[in-house]
Every structure is written in structure tokens, then in C-alpha cells.
């Protein structure tokens, strides 16, 4: 089950997965409790239950000093990055308990391990996700449900291009080069690399893994 706000993007993703059977989509905003509950109910109706949750909704928000941020800007990032993850967990836990097992994977960020000027809402939200994951892992371990987080570094996708243009509006390419210079592996990661880590955490190869944060950052945090 693919869940997201954009029907057009969901359709495009489903078409990319045309080689797989039983791929369907449900339009819902992760910050909308009723819509999230409905998405989980639709999943149960279509597949008989919930085995795996990948909480992947996220936004970078606008970059600004703390004193310049508006309440709306700060709340918007936290609603998507924290409330969205929590709501997805909230409505997937009971179906997983009924099956006696499950794997919850929250896509967070290296931002949950560091500070960064002008990124207060994003940094705060990703620290919160790590705390939520650790707490949920402790609550749910006895029910056979594993909860882990993935902490990507810079990944070659829309979000990093948005950040590049905000870091240096006059020369996004220079921002790109500066960010890459901070990565020991000297490149951005790919969506596929993050997906492969999620597959590991979703599968039987990781049945003793819970409450952990898996960095995929080209060595950024180690540097």
C-alpha cells in the first residue's frame, strides 16, 4: 500500500512498480489523523493486516534563524516530521499486535544527531523522531514488533536540491560542492540505497534489531 498526499505521484510510483503484484495506493495526508486511520483500514481490507510500516513523510521547511521563524513555519515541520510518524505508528500498532509481529521503520535524518544553524524546526523534528522510535521499541518489543529508524545523510533527491537553493540562493551548485566536501565518501546517497536499508529492517535478516538508529550518510557522522 502506497500512501501519500499526491494522487499523481502515487500513480507514477505504482506504475514504476508494475512488475509487482497487488500494489495499490491511498491518498492521505500523514498529519491528518482521520485520513491516516482510513489509510490503515484500507490496507487491512486489501491485505488482511499490517506487517510493515515505513514512515517516510518528511519536509525540510524554510531555513531561517530561530528569531525569524514564524509559529506556522515551525509547527508545519513538526506536524509532518513528528506527528505524521506518530500517527502512522498509532494506527499500525494494534493490527501488528493482532498478527503477533511487525516492523516499523521511521525515515529520519542525520539531523537527529547534530545541530545546524537556520534549521531549528528540521533538526528538532528529527531528534524527536529518534526519541519516539526508541520509546516505541521499548513499549512494543514484548508484542513482537520491532521499531527502528534510518538516518540518511544528503540524498540525491528533491529535498537536498531545495536545501542547496536555500543555503546559497545565488549559487546552488556551490552549495552542492560544499556539502559533498563534508562527506567522506564524496558523494550524495541515492533513494535506492536508503530503500535497501529499509528492506533489510523489514525482513527476516533483522529480527533481533529494534530500538536502533541506522545511519546511511557516507561517513558524515563519523567524520
Model segments located where?
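Short, small/polar-rich loop/turn modules that mediate ligand/substrate recognition or access, typified
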Residues: 141, 146, 209-211
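Substrate-binding pocket helix/loop in short-chain dehydrogenase/reductase
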Residues: 64-66, 70-75, 179
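Active-site helix of classical SDR
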Residues: 89, 125, 133
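Short, flexible catalytic-loop segment of classical short-chain dehydrogenase/reductase
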Residues: 130, 147, 152-166
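Residue(s) in the substrate-gating loop at a strand-loop-helix junction
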Residues: 109
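C-terminal substrate-recognition "lid" of short-chain dehydrogenase/reductases
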Residues: 86-89, 187-216, 221
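Conserved glycine-rich Rossmann-like NAD(P)H-binding loop of the short-chain dehydrogenase/reductase
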Residues: 1-12
Amino acid at each position: 500500500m502506497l500512501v501519500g498526499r499526491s494522487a499523481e505521484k502515487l500513480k507514477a510510483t505504482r506504475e514504476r512498480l508494475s512488475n509487482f503484484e497487488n500494489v495499490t495506493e491511498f491518498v492521505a495526508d500523514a498529519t491528518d489523523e482521520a485520513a491516516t486511520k482510513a489509510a490503515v483500514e484500507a490496507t487491512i481490507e486489501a491485505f488482511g493486516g499490517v506487517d510493515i510500516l515505513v514512515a517516510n513523510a518528511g519536509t525540510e521547511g524554510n531555513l531561517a534563524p530561530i528569531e525569524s521563524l514564524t509559529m506556522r513555519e515551525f509547527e508545519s515541520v513538526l506536524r509532518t516530521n513528528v506527528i505524521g510518524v506518530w500517527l502512522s505508528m498509532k494506527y499500525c500498532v494494534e493490527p501488528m499486535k493482532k498478527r503477533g509481529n511487525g516492523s516499523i521503520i521511521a525515515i529520519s535524518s542525520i539531523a537527529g544527531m547534530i545541530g545546524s544553524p537556520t534549521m531549528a524546526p528540521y533538526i528538532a523534528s528529527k531528534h524527536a523522531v529518534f526519541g519516539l522510535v526508541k520509546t516505541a521499541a521499548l513499549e512494543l518489543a514484548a508484542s513482537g514488533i520491532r521499531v527502528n529508524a534510518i538516518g540518511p545523510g544528503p540524498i540525491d533527491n528533491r529535498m537536498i536540491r531545495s536545501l542547496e537553493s536555500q543555503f546559497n540562493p545565488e549559487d546552488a551548485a556551490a552549495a552542492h560542492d560544499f556539502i559533498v566536501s563534508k562527506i567522506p565518501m564524496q558523494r550524495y546517497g541515492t533513494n535506492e540505497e536508503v530503500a535497501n536499508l529499509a528492506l533489510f529492517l523489514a525482513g527476516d535478516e533483522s529480527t533481533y534489531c529494534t530500538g536502533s538508529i541506522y545511519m546511511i550518510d557516507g561517513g558524515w557522522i563519523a567524520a
